[in-house]
Amino acid sequence: MSAMLQCMSHTPLKGYFDPAADVVEEVAALAAAVREEVAHFDPEVVYLFAPDHYNGFFLDLMPQFCLGIEATSVGDYQTPKGPLRVPRALAEACAGAVIARGIDLAFSYRMQVDHGFAQTLVEVLGGLARYPVVPIMINAVAPPLASFQRARLLGAAVGEFARGQGGRALFIASGGMSHNPPIPQIATATDPEVIERIVAGRNPTPEARAARQQRTVAAAQAFAAGDSPLRPLNPDWDRALMKRLCSRDWAAIDAYRNDEVSAAAGASAHELKSWVAATAAMESATAGQWDARERYYRAIPEWLAGFGAMSGLGRHP
């Protein structure tokens, strides 16, 4: 089989509150280059690991990992709304194989995904339904959270399944890097409306979604101005993790502890478990016969995130 890895940050703030024009152009050029590589590779199936932000998954039932057998984008921020092109039989087989490997993977025949999936599908693939995609959600916002090691084992199980299928497989990770956006937590929330939104906030009105999005924009504006209680970005931490992923230093990655990650890089740095899972999938699918490269990093306060990208290409006889 042939395999490709593409890991890239996402940001809901793109187009709402942007950094300087040259930075916007730099990131757009990165996305265009990745799309061109993907088009040339022409994957037969895509395995996309990404988080949710209380838009598709809620505290009434929050899995650590969930594979979508049918999935639809909710269309938050400026992402398109509509169905993903999920190959049902393949997704069902993947879920079964991963569970057989000892990973307690949830699955959904009516999965809703947000910008964490949709923005990456558009920017990396060129659209929600351009290629067959198996979407896999990794909980990164609602403690208690699975460990980095469990994310690796999830990815390894997916990669082993993909290797057995053969063909051209693309593994994508969306999320990160260091960031600490104003996502409410059940442990500290006091407003009944906020609590209800994170427990069972499916299908909000357009007005409610717009108000939530405006609060995120306001938080980004304050953060960029240096007038925010949000945790600072941590470029050194981000670069160290990328380096460990590129070298496949699994012992170091397995040693990451959730509380230490939150303290060093912010509560939403756990989105990088998507990168860990996708990289582990690539490693397993190719039996280690692949090359990785760090291709981009910039701390972008306007987007409330360290923005990074890494890629890989390999094959297994």
UniProtKB/Swiss-Prot annotation:
GO BP, sorted A to Z: 3-phenylpropionate catabolic process
Keyword DNA repair: no
Positions of disulphide bridges: none
Active-site residues, record numbering mapped to chain: H115, H179
Gene from which this protein is expressed: mhpB
Enzyme nomenclature, EC number: 1.13.11.16
Task of the protein: Catalyzes the non-heme iron(II)-dependent oxidative cleavage of 2,3-dihydroxyphenylpropionic acid and 2,3-dihydroxicinnamic acid into 2-hydroxy-6-ketononadienedioate and 2-hydroxy-6-ketononatrienedioate, respectively.
Gene3D superfamilies: LigB-like
Alphabetically ordered keywords of this record: Aromatic hydrocarbons catabolism, Dioxygenase, Iron, Oxidoreductase
Domain of life: Bacteria
Molecular-function annotations in GO: 3-carboxyethylcatechol 2,3-dioxygenase activity; ferrous iron binding
InterPro entries: DHPP/DHXA_dioxygenase (IPR023789), Xdiol_dOase_suB (IPR004183)
Family: Belongs to the LigB/MhpB extradiol dioxygenase family.
Source taxonomy: Bacteria, Pseudomonadati, Pseudomonadota, Betaproteobacteria, Rhodocyclales
Cofactor: Fe(2+)
CDD domains given in the database record: MhpB_like
Identification of the protein by name: 2,3-dihydroxyphenylpropionate/2,3-dihydroxicinnamic acid 1,2-dioxygenase
Pfam families listed in its UniProt record: LigB
Metabolic or biological pathway: Aromatic compound metabolism; 3-phenylpropanoate degradation
Quaternary structure note: Homotetramer.
Substrates-to-products reaction catalysed: 3-(2,3-dihydroxyphenyl)propanoate + O2 = (2Z,4E)-2-hydroxy-6-oxonona-2,4-dienedioate + H(+); (2E)-3-(2,3-dihydroxyphenyl)prop-2-enoate + O2 = (2Z,4E,7E)-2-hydroxy-6-oxonona-2,4,7-trienedioate + H(+)
